[in-house]
């Protein structure tokens, strides 16, 4: 594309969305869901998630179309609607969520390789960390070659990893047994699951994790060949991934019972297929997961760097994060991101951090950026901004924005106090970069309202720090 160097077409944007969302989560979905919910609650939970996440997808589509001048997605929307500190917090939270997720992906990737090579163990052995480090820096230098080139490789890996998922769904359809599916719909035989409402709430963080990446196209809005493709890519990607997730989860519950699924090791999809067709099924899914994780890692390294770069371009992050190399890659943002991943990979050697604990924390960090995006879409509709002579569209977007905002608040509630406090602990140190950016502009760090918000973050962070010290909070 010599006439538009480095620009991303619709297919590449859809692949970024699908590639970001289909990472490791879907391959562990049968066990992750069965651990907290039975059939009835799973169906209710997916219904809530489908409506909530679809409204979020529409939010990102609407904002991409109505505010095409805002680059950087979740960061830009929070800043435009609610000020500099909220914009910074969205960028900071999204960035931490993304690289924490990458650490989790590396752990899961080498845990899966441990199926073939026992030296990698559960993904946190010395050999696994060395292997993960080599792969991390290989991806790093690949991305340095250019966004377009990396996006093309992501397109290839996205296509490659969808094939084993399609095979799983086709085989599972024929292996599905209605009597297994309906054996204990509400989980009454397993009191540990709690009430149906408890089951639904407990599965929410997992459903959010498997959908993180829905905003991927909006993050790259400035690099899209057509701005209108950003919204299309978001909705196409969402519907594709939703179908896969629901089919994988629901069909598994008709092959093995909830207690059986809950006891499986991850990637549990491999064990489900092995139950149906034998050993080759587990090998197929394991290979699919490895390809999937490699693609997801690439997507998330791109997203990490881009969100910091977008915020720095707008003077909300410090100037040094604006630097691009000759291939138009935000080089300093990329280095900062991958150094943090490397540090936490080493930490996994000395801590009890597992894939799931990393994923829950990463999920909790992204809830605030989602909340502000939904709130901004609702704010535009309430004010009527960009809706001149479009009353019907304004009413529609009022409803969509309202549902998306309620859903975002529900997710924070479902995540629980523990992850709210741990999020505050990770949000608080970001003020150092925010203050540096403000100092470079010669402006005061906070407005009066922002001082109050930051004070609340600090209180939450102090409670979390004490909780970790005292032992009533754990990572």
For every predicted segment, state its role:
Residues 113, 127-180, 234-238, 363-368, ...:
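Membrane-interface loop-to-helix entry segments
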Residues 75-78, 83, 115-120, 190, ...:
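TM-loop-TM module centered on a large, flexible mid-protein loop between adjacent transmembrane helices
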């Amino acid at each position: 594309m010599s006439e538009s160097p480095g620009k991303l077409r619709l297919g590449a944007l859809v692949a970024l969305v699908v590639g970001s969302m289909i990472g490791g989560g879907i391959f562990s979905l049968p066990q992750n869901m069965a651990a907290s919910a039975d059939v009835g609650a799973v169906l209710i939970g997916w219904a809530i998630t489908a409506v909530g996440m679809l409204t979020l997808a529409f939010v990102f589509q609407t904002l991409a179309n109505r505010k095409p001048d805002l680059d950087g997605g979740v960061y830009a929307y929070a800043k435009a609607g609610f000020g500099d500190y909220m914009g910074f917090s969205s960028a900071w939270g999204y960035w931490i969520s993304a690289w924490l997720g990458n650490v989790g992906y590396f752990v899961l990737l080498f845990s899966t390789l441990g199926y073939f090579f026992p030296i990698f163990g559960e993904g946190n052995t010395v050999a696994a960390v060395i292997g993960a480090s080599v792969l991390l820096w290989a991806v790093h230098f690949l991305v340095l070659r250019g966004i377009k080139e990396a996006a093309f490789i992501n397109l290839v890996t996205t296509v490659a990893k969808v094939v084993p998922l399609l095979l799983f769904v086709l085989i599972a359809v024929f292996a599905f047994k209605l009597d297994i599916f309906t054996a204990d719909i509400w989980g009454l035989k397993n009191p540990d699951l709690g009430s149906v409402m408890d089951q639904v709430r407990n599965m929410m963080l997992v459903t959010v994790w498997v959908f993180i990446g829905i905003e991927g196209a909006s993050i790259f809005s400035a690099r899209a060949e057509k701005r209108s493709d950003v919204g299309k890519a978001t909705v196409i990607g969402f519907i594709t991934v939703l179908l896969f997730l629901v089919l994988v989860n629901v069909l598994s519950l008709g092959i093995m019972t909830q207690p059986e699924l809950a006891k499986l090791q991850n990637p549990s999809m491999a064990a489900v297929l092995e139950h149906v067709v034998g050993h080759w099924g587990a090998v197929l899914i394991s290979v699919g997961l490895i390809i999937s994780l490699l693609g997801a890692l690439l997507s998330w390294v791109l997203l990490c760097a881009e969100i910091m770069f977008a915020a720095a371009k707008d003077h909300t992050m410090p100037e040094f994060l604006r630097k691009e190399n000759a291939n138009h890659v935000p080089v300093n943002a990329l280095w900062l991101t991958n150094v943090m991943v490397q540090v936490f990979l080493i930490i996994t050697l000395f801590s009890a951090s597992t894939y799931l604990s990393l994923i829950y924390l990463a999920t909790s960090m992204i809830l605030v950026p989602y909340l502000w995006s939904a709130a901004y879409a609702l704010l535009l509709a309430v004010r009527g901004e960009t809706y001149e002579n479009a009353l019907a569209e304004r009413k529609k977007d009022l409803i969509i924005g309202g549902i998306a905002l309620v859903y975002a608040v529900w997710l924070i509630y479902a995540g629980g106090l523990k992850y709210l406090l741990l999020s505050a602990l990770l949000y608080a140190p970001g003020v150092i970069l925010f203050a540096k950016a403000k100092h470079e502009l010669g402006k005061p760090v906070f407005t009066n309202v922002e001082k109050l918000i930051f004070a609340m973050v600090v209180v939450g962070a102090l409670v979390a720090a004490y909780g970790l010290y005292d032992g009533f909070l754990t990572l």
